[in-house]
Amino acid sequence: MNLKTGRVLKISGPLVVAEGMEEANIYDVVKVGEKRLIGEIIEMREDRASIQVYEETAGLAPGDPVITTGEPLSVELGPGLIEAMFDGIQRPLNAIKAKAGDFITRGVEVHSLDRDRKWHFTPLKKVGDTVEAGDVIGIVQETSIVEHKIMVPYGIKGTIETIEEGDFTVVDTVAKVKDKDKVSDLIMMQKWPVRRGRPYGRKLNPVEPMITGQRVIDTFFPVTKGGTACVPGPFGSGKTVVQHQLAKWADAQIVVYIGCGERGNEMTDVLNEFPELKDPKTGEPLMKRTVLIANTSNMPVAAREASIYTGITIGEYFRDMGYSVALMADSTSRWAEALREMSGRLEEMPGDEGYPAYLGSRAADFYERAGKVLSLGSEGREGALTVIGAVSPPGGDLSEPVTQATLRIVKVFWGLDSQLAYRRHFPAINWLNSYSLYLEKISPWMDENVASDWTALRTRAMSLLQEEANLEEIVRLVGIDALSEKDRLKLEVAKSLREDYLQQNAFHEVDTYASLEKQYKMLKLVLFFYDETQRALNAGVYLKELLDLEVRDKIARAKYVSEESIENIDAIFNELSEVIDELISKGGIMNA
């Protein structure tokens, strides 16, 4: 497309204003200056275009050429996404390193997907079959655990004229589809504009929980497959570790991890850990199901906005294949700060704390692309895209605009508490402030698939923790001696729930992940201890004797029982019953 070349009129950090751009459109990608820096038009006024440049603008000068490509910012979708690491505008970092060295050179142009690598394509359709947008015509075994489904692109339908098995690159024709007189070549790669959500058949009601292996989340504040959640918390409260834990252990088939404006070391941790950690379901390295988007704090600010959209478009693509996808965005506050900076340079009217007035609608555009859907196509595939965004409110102030805009949209809130973090209680999710609006939808699934009394146990445990908070107020005022033995027992059981159940060590090889079966048995064990000790108290046994029982140590160590030895927890139930029976039979006099 030969479009007229514009000229740079003004440069203000990542914002460039160009004139002579009357042939361009809003959101077109442009190449700025002699080095052809990548930018995107975000505002048009007559022949002037305001461009946010995704690379460092130092060295640009008024009068430099600006060439529009005539296309919106798009991502390439096809085999080669899994195990790859991209920057915010989907440039593969490995390819950039091979071409330009360890540092990203300005204006470097590389294809998002490798044009030389060949993939083995196995057709699932044959000549003469009728296909429509979204139909799977063949598969590519991308990694040992991900089967990449090659779908008919949106807008194409007809009858297959040719299709063949073999080794192809992502730009080789693998099939031809004829519709009336028009013949379309199908390749293994699609392009899709990042700011436009990928189409689907219809949205479905999410009812199945996304199992994370984190007890406080799965038991008290679960998120569904296709749900939305946010993790706000002050600095040092463990947001990134929570995000890493979810990326490691969530039972999603694909994980998209976006490091948006956070420290580079955190992405390095992911790169070092994921190839070595094994997926509990498949036994394969976690990296074989992961796409990484690294847009660290020292990369250009404008690209932070693009990285969020790049990541969710890749997530939607795998969702359309029928996969359950989990997307982690760490942190959406940095993305909002990028919006604020661009809004300030555009001289727009500021909203709360300088953020643009459209912050809420932009956040909604992002989170509303999550969901469980029936994909396009005749097969009726169901896919889910779960979005979990970290929010970094300055000073932990949850009333600031980004947190409030996010809370209006998402249905799960995992509030991280600096006080819990200072007490070394991790994950530092405050059980009194956090909530999940999916509980009613998930409870029937849990009762059916885990245990019939799961919901009842969860409700009892939550009420104990809330009663503990009330009793602690009394203890602070008049001291623990003013409490009855039954209330003191409640405090001890709530402490056991906090320390033996909710606390979880992300860096312990066993405690880092707990299956639902193990979570159920651990929770039931703590509440069984409460029931049995209440029975003993009513029979006249002294509270001190009950609290000194050796079996309490075994309850505390239940979290370190491996998944293969879960039956060992059952033995603690029997031992506890026997000890309590013996105490009662001796009238409460026993050296336990």
From Swiss-Prot:
Binding of ATP, residues: G233, P234, F235, G236, S237, G238, K239, T240
Pfam families named in the record: ATP-synt_ab, ATP-synt_ab_N, ATP-synt_ab_Xtn, ATP-synt_VA_C
Cellular component per GO, a single term: proton-transporting ATP synthase complex
This enzyme's EC code(s): 7.1.2.2
BP term (GO), one: proton motive force-driven plasma membrane ATP synthesis
Reaction(s) catalysed (UniProt annotation): ATP + H2O + 4 H(+)(in) = ADP + phosphate + 5 H(+)(out)
Gene Ontology MF annotations: ATP binding; proton-transporting ATP synthase activity, rotational mechanism; proton-transporting ATPase activity, rotational mechanism
Source organism superkingdom: Bacteria
The UniProt record lists the keyword Signal: no
Keywords of the record: ATP synthesis, ATP-binding, Hydrogen ion transport, Ion transport, Nucleotide-binding, Translocase, Transport
EC primary class: translocase
Family annotation (SUPFAM superfamilies): C-terminal domain of alpha and beta subunits of F1 ATP synthase (SSF47917), N-terminal domain of alpha and beta subunits of F1 ATP synthase (SSF50615), P-loop containing nucleoside triphosphate hydrolases (SSF52540)
Protein task: Produces ATP from ADP in the presence of a proton gradient across the membrane. The V-type alpha chain is a catalytic subunit.
Protein name per UniProt: V-type ATP synthase alpha chain
Species of provenance: Clostridium botulinum (strain Okra / Type B1)
